Swiss-Prot record:
This is Ribosomal RNA small subunit methyltransferase A. SMART domains: rADc. HAMAP family: 16SrRNA_methyltr_A. It comes from the Bacteria. It comes from Histophilus somni (strain 2336). GO terms for cellular component: cytosol. It catalyses: adenosine(1518)/adenosine(1519) in 16S rRNA + 4 S-adenosyl-L-methionine = N(6)-dimethyladenosine(1518)/N(6)-dimethyladenosine(1519) in 16S rRNA + 4 S-adenosyl-L-homocysteine + 4 H(+). Keywords: Cytoplasm, Methyltransferase, RNA-binding, rRNA processing, S-adenosyl-L-methionine, Transferase. It is found in: Cytoplasm. One of its GO terms (molecular function) is 16S rRNA (adenine(1518)-N(6)/adenine(1519)-N(6))-dimethyltransferase activity. The lineage of its organism: Bacteria, Pseudomonadati, Pseudomonadota, Gammaproteobacteria, Pasteurellales. InterPro entries: KsgA/Erm, rRNA_Ade_diMease-like_C, rRNA_Ade_Mease_Trfase_CS, rRNA_Ade_methylase_Trfase_N, rRNA_adenine_dimethylase, SAM-dependent_MTases_sf. Its main location: cytoplasm.
């Protein structure tokens, strides 16, 4: 039977806990993050401190956000790092990163947040969507994720991995794969392969939309029916004539459109919101 206990703490399934313990992998991740002494770093889900300790050694202060009460308390009493750590016991998916940015006077210091973490795989996608809202105040993000999620983040159009997550991530960020991580690097070992990704928010959005609601709406509708042609998948939002006028191939499918295409559709809807569902033509 595989042990779920590491360094005296039993992994909790509801928090999706898998603790990183491979020192070579840890050092490679820290090198990729490249923390600098004066920078403001935030770790999400520090767990038992595998990344916390080597990163904290390189900075003056490190903020960590941990939902597990036992782990948060453990970090508050860390034998040699507790004075460097600002431990916030909170759900990162509900956390207001802009308030942290304001409280720390980062604008006056001409700094942005640098965010990293070994994310629980069961919340990684909604957590990234939450963080994208704060793209203007984030310098970069480094996350350990399920390998398949990293493939989706990095995907190009016309591929099976390309989807709504791809579009939303690349709308806000430059996405770069960093390294792959085997299950044996964790305790307990997950059943899936993992990988580290770097997300660098664009200083200027390459395809700005007028209202994110419509980008979310059109991508959700298209990819929820990705086997259908766009003529059918988007029939409640656009007539066939309008799609053609917007330079969209009626026989194309969701994965065939670029981010620029989806932004163009979203901006049309922002200016011309459908008053009621259209019928397929």
């Amino acid at each position: 039977m595989k042990s779920k206990t590491h360094l005296g703490h039993t992994a909790r399934k509801r928090f999706g806990q898998n603790f990183l313990h491979d020192n070579n992998i840890i050092q490679n991740i820290v090198m990729a993050i490249y923390p600098q002494k004066e920078q403001f770093l935030v770790e999400i889900g520090p767990g038992l401190g595998a990344l916390t300790e080597p990163v904290a050694e390189k900075v003056e202060r490190l903020t960590v956000i941990e939902l597990d009460r036992d782990l948060a308390e453990r970090l508050r009493h860390h034998p040699f790092l507790h004075q460097k750590l600002n431990v916030i016991e909170y759900d990162a998916m509900q956390f207001n990163f802009e308030q942290l940015y304001i409280d720390e006077n980062l604008a006056e210091k001409n700094q942005k947040l640098r965010v990293f973490g070994n994310l629980p795989y069961n919340i990684s996608t909604p957590l990234m969507f939450h963080l994208f809202k704060y793209h203007a105040i984030i310098q970069d993000m480094h996350f350990m994720l399920q390998k398949e999620v990293v493939k989706r983040l990095c995907a190009a159009p016309n591929s099976k991995a390309y989807g709504r997550l791809t579009i939303m991530a690349q709308y806000f960020c430059q996405v770069l794969p960093v390294l792959e991580v085997p299950p044996t690097a964790f305790k307990p070992a997950p059943k899936v392969e993992s990988a580290v990704v770097r997300l660098i928010p664009h200083k200027e959005l390459p395809y700005p939309v007028k209202d994110l609601y419509w980008l979310n709406r059109v991508t959700t509708q298209a990819f929820n029916q990705r086997r259908k042609t766009l003529r059918n998948a988007l029939s409640t939002l656009f007539s066939a004539e309008k799609l053609t006028a917007l330079a969209i191939d009626l026989e194309a499918r969701a994965e065939n459109l670029s981010i620029a295409d989806y932004a163009r559709l979203a901006n049309y809807l922002a200016d011309n919101p459908p008053t009621e569902d259209l019928q397929s033509e």
